[in-house]
Amino acid sequence: MKRSCENDVSVLRYGHRPGRDDRMTTHVGLTARALGADQVIFPDNATQSAETVSDIVSRFGGPFDVERTDGLNATIREWSGTVIHLTMYGERVQDVTEVIRETCLHHQPLLIIIGGEKVPSDVYEWADWNIAVTNQPHSEVAGLAVFLDRLFMGQELEQEWAGAEHVVVPQACGKRVVDAELTTEADEMNAEK
């Protein structure tokens, strides 16, 4: 799956408590990028998370946009597309994802809201869909990962990353990271054989 950064799928992190949420907010952005979203929108006070995710994009490729806003509510209310709120109180993901994929994905921009603190009741009303992964308390990052994988039907796992400085080489054992230029040269040499 080639990446085309059209911002069809955006993830909005609703709320951020500096110090307490830094790691989780960063993981929301990294998960959004790795599993097929085109952009993440962080609260304005999530500076460290935005910088970390932007650094990963520059080192491991994109396209992927990282934005910050002090107008989370306005972003949701003014969204010109479908708004999806991931919450343990919503409809079961397995019951609604196919409908969302068929009627919304590639037809209009999607905004996926992930809570970082107590989400106001207005967000439930502004959302076109309130969706739950298991209707049980667990990590918002896990919920995002499951939802994106179901939305893209696993195709996001085949992404190619443009502009990467480094490439992770899959291996059964150990770790191997190479310069992207070396990977491209090796691929070209293998193609010529």
Swiss-Prot record:
Gene3D superfamilies: 3.40.1280.10. Keywords: Cytoplasm, Methyltransferase, S-adenosyl-L-methionine, Transferase, tRNA processing. One of its GO terms (biological process) is tRNA nucleoside ribose methylation. It comes from the Archaea. It is found in: Cytoplasm. GO terms for molecular function: tRNA (cytidine(56)-2'-O)-methyltransferase activity. InterPro entries: Alpha/beta_knot_MTases, tRNA_m1G_MTases_N, tRNA_mtfrase_aTrm56. One of its GO terms (cellular component) is cytoplasm. The keyword Acetylation does not apply. S-adenosyl-L-methionine binds at residues 86, 115-119. SUPFAM superfamilies: alpha/beta knot. It is an enzyme of class 2 (transferase). Its EC number is 2.1.1.206. It catalyses: cytidine(56) in tRNA + S-adenosyl-L-methionine = 2'-O-methylcytidine(56) in tRNA + S-adenosyl-L-homocysteine + H(+). PANTHER family: TRNA (CYTIDINE(56)-2'-O)-METHYLTRANSFERASE. NCBIfam families: PRK03958.1. Specifically catalyzes the AdoMet-dependent 2'-O-ribose methylation of cytidine at position 56 in tRNAs. Belongs to the aTrm56 family. Homodimer. This is tRNA (cytidine(56)-2'-O)-methyltransferase. It comes from Haloquadratum walsbyi (strain DSM 16790 / HBSQ001).
